[in-house]
């Protein structure tokens, strides 16, 4: 189903798409997926129905909150790794629907114990209640400013006006990102570093999770 407007995030950059329900005069259906085609967002319904006319999309608030917490947590981890490990870049990221995530970094010489020790400063940032804001800069500025683009392989797509979205954590970090985040770091549950794996000669994989969810429930 294609709608004129939608409040749902289609996913990308390692973040899962929003979940929700579509309601219209003739019924309702869970939204099983979101797909971009022809520059428009299509809502894939879980049931074989025909929907038309005025419709209402309701996002799954609990799932979106979890994604916001997890995504903000990965930004904090990213910032601390970048600052403490010589500007190490991200080589991969994936957030999961059980409140866990993994981030891969180009860290061939890193001490895994020092990486595990980042759990305490991550949670200290949470306790500091730092504001999280978004601003837009030109592509040229994003590409020429050290540290704004942290991934070795991908960058958020520009807007129709050629601007790049930058997520700022007050006093801590600025980086390009198109996903959803908290308005304040204090709105997150604590985060635990679950495991660190060596993935090849260069990559270290850090697995983290929200305390109280999934394996940390």
What annotation goes with each model-predicted range?
Residues 1-217:
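Active-/binding-site microenvironments in catalytic and ligand-binding cores
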């Amino acid at each position: 189903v294609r709608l004129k407007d939608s409040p749902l995030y289609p996913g990308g950059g390692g973040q899962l798409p929003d979940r929700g329900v579509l309601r219209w005069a003739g019924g309702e259906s869970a939204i099983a997926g979101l797909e971009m085609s022809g520059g428009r967002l299509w809502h894939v319904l879980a049931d074989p129905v025909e929907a038309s006319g005025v419709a209402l999309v309701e996002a799954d608030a609990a799932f979106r909150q979890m994604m916001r917490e997890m995504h903000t947590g990965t930004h904090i981890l990213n910032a601390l790794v970048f600052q403490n490990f010589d500007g190490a870049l991200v080589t991969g990221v994936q957030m999961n629907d059980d409140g866990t995530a993994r981030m891969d970094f180009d860290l061939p010489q890193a001490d895994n114990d020092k990486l595990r020790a980042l759990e305490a400063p991550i949670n200290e940032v949470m306790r500091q209640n730092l504001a999280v804001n978004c601003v837009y800069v030109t592509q040229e500025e994003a590409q020429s400013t050290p540290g704004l683009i942290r991934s070795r392989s991908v960058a958020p797509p520009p807007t129709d006006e050629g601007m790049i979205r930058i997520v700022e954590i007050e006093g801590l970090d600025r980086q390009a990102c198109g996903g959803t985040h908290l308005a304040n770091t204090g709105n997150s549950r604590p985060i635990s570093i679950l495991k660190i794996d060596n993935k090849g000669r260069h990559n270290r994989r850090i697995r983290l999770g929200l305390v109280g969810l999934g394996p940390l429930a």
